[in-house]
Amino acid sequence: MAAPILKDVVAYVEVWSSNGTENYSKTFTTQLVDMGAKVSKTFNKQVTHVIFKDGYQSTWDKAQKRGVKLVSVLWVEKCRTAGAHIDESLFPAANTNEHLPSLIKKKRKCMQPKDFNFKTPENDKRFQKKFEKMAKELQRQKTSLDGGVPILLFESNGSLIYSPTIEINSSHHSAMENRLQEMKEKRENLSPTSSQMIQQSHDNPSNSLCEAPLNISHDTLCSGESFAGGLHSSFDDLCGNSGCGNQERKLGGSINDIKSDMCISSLVLKANNTHSSPSFTHLDKSSPQKFLSNLSKEEINLQRNIAGKIVTPDQKQAAGMSQETFEEKYRLSPTLSSTKGHLLIHSRPRSSSVKRKRVSHGSHSPPKEKCKRKRSIRRSIMPRLQLCRSEGSLQHVAGPALQALSCGESSYDDYFSPDNLKERNSENLPPESQLPSSPAQFSCRSLSKKERTSIFEMSDFSCVGKKTRTVDIISFTAKTISSPQKTGNGEGLATLSCVTSEESSAPEEALRCCRQAGKEDACPEGNGFSYTIEDPVLPKGHDGDLTPLEGNLEEVKEAVGLKSTQNKGTTSKISNSSEGEAQSEHEPCFIGDCNMETSTEEKENLPGGYSGSVKNRPTRHDVLDDSCDGFKDLIKPHEELKKSERGKKPTRTLVMTSMPSEKQNVIIQVVDKLKGFSIAPDVCETTTHVLSGKPLRTLNVLLGIARGCWVLSYDWVLWSLELGHWISEEPFELSNHFPAAPLCRSECHLSAGPYRGTLFADQPVMFVSPASSPPVAKLCELVHLCGGRVSQVPRQASIVIGPYSGKKKATVKYLSEKWVLDSITQHKVCASENYLLSQ
């Protein structure tokens, strides 16, 4: 670096090319700095030398006016080469444009790119001032007693985090802190999760399993996502393989089954919490081993008495094998079976019913067929729709026909999948499985989807009720409904209708299955597709076991909206008058079908003959139509609710006023996160909240006051963001600046209909001048919202608001617009003398 020969020089450099497009000031600035001179970026009072060449005329004039030395670039070069401070008078600057007329102002534009200099407080004055201001503010916040300002952090993923350090309202904040601390301390008293319930079930499997599902909240049970994973997973994953099943898997699968049942029939669950059937209570009290042995004895006795056929030991062994197969496959303990009896009163214990079905099949089929069936069921849990039973087969039904274990939607789809087509085609019932007394039946090969459709299309519904006595099954998306019958020997059997639906079934699929059920009902030969399952006989004297259900059935009737004229509908064919009386006496109602309890008078008036009993009841096809209508009525509100929730926008709007753009962006993000509001530019009928960045009396604030809205500060949004929900508005209301806001809001909440203030109700008719400010429309809206009357013409008005240029009357008051604005702000009519306009 050269010697500081120009240390006393403060220079301002303005060196341009002759055509005014190139700026060469930087080169000479560097040379001057090297020689110890101080170079100023602006032409201020400290400047002593101006290095000038083809610069601005204003710079030349200013230098001459101040008496600053004007030198050329040659002076700088001479000083550098000589190494000394040369006399400025030897190298005066020349202004070539001084004597030219300035008719056209030539705009200089440097074509050279500017060097990017990172702004720091040292090289940028504005940045330095801003930095000093922030430092002072930070120091003030540290020393003040109120604490610091809230901090907003924007993370890399775009999420917004609020870290408040200031207490808006100390009492409000402390109460909130105490509440959060209390919730943390009481966390162990919250509802147990499903995993905790499974752990509890290990300690006390007989009691806790019955109680744990009932402790779950109703909302959790009935949500569409609660147990979707359990329903759609395979049975092997839930229950394990047949060889290695431990107690934990048994309990897990059983609990999932119980939960799904509770979700399925939520209407009945409410009543089941207070009512329980005595018949199921006595089943629950008995031990599991005794219960199973009783079932086997009852079945053997029934087969001996009714069919006249003694069961051989081989058949007993086959029945035992089928029971073991079912236990290994489904992992349902007898205790859990009786538990289901408590949870769903209108549903038999499924494990026992399906075991009985297995026993009945096993007594007439060889072990090879059972092995095949075991393999096929491992792939498809859905029970096959067996082809027609004979008249004699119905006589084997010792109790009400009951539906088999219902499975999830995935099982239903799996049955019709191409993977199982081969198995279903090869699955034949052997001739030995048919009873000797049964008449000719269909081929027992399972039908494919195309064959089923073709048979449904050719079906003749005229033969309904003529010949068959089998119990038909109506499928509502894997719902199998069976209506029990009372046998001819006069045993007092409690009849029960079973509805078991899967947890989540699409309404469209349900309606489609309802239509398929209507087609599937009958066939040209008069034999319907049916599935007859034997059920354990309840002891005599239990005819009244269904009385707790009657109240529940009335609730279900109201929910489905079915008419009393449909009470005669039934899902089973009536064989004789005794069966018809038993059917009408005990026939229950269930969701998705139109069966209603027949009154005692109708039961007594039923004819004794079979033909009369059939005449009094509608055909099967009519019942199916009514069932479909009832099911449509049931699912229609849920569909409409989902659509309305999906397409519905928030009805409340939020308006921002006097808000900087940074805060507006924050509010938009918070509203998008917490929902519940839509942002509007101006106050309208749906506006409930007005957010003001500064306590200024804007038009939106006045309209918000007139409409009874919350007028809040920006901090309400920040605190709501911190707590994750919209909090109470009262601590953040700007009532000090706008005293009318809480008063109008209270009046709005107390008003029955649409709110309209009474501030100007006693004032005469007003006319708003077109030249008024705020605009006429907004001012008229304010007057109208506060109960005033506005005229379109001045001759009908006694008060004129705003500047009026027409002929003035002595009887009319000419007031300023501030009279309206101040009256609304203070919530009282201000004295008009202070707002009179000059005549």
From Swiss-Prot:
UniProt source species: Pongo pygmaeus (Bornean orangutan)
Main function: Implicated in chromosome condensation and DNA damage induced cellular responses. May play a role in neurogenesis and regulation of the size of the cerebral cortex.
An example Gene Ontology CC term for this record: cytoplasm
Modified positions (Phosphoserine) in chain numbering: S279, S287, S296, S333
Oligomer status and interactors: Interacts with CDC27 and maybe other components of the APC/C complex. Interacts with histone variant H2AX under DNA damage conditions.
Main location as per UniProt: cytoplasm
UniProt protein name: Microcephalin
Superkingdom field: Eukaryota
Alphabetical list of Pfam families matching this protein: Microcephalin (PF12258), PTCB-BRCT (PF12738)
